[in-house]
Amino acid sequence: MDHVQVDYPTVGTAVITFRGEHDLVARDELRAMLDLLVEQHTLVVADFSEAKFVDSTTLHALLDADMAARRQGRKFRLLLDTQAIVRAAFELSGVLNRLDYTNSRAEALGDESPAPFVY
């Protein structure tokens, strides 16, 4: 996938950074990548700070990854220090009511759950 990069800042942690636009075209690759990361790491952070657009297939893949992580006793977290249009997709879809998220990379990589976003 051209628009994602995976980094491993600490043992057991993976950060998948989304750049540009994310839609139906790369759905299957994204699902496979998220499944693998959740299986192999205790914390997976999906970083949308460089994303320009996300569609419902991306949001659904994130929800599925979160459910898989919870079943395995692992953590899945969003980093949403991002553009207003991307944040709006998360807010309007209701995804933020179901997923752990923060606006801070340091908080996203920490052990404690981030505080909810406050307007």
Please place each PLM-identified region on the residue numbering.
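ABC-family nucleotide-binding domains
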Residues: D55
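STAS-like cytosolic regulatory interaction modules
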Residues: M1-K52, D64-Y119
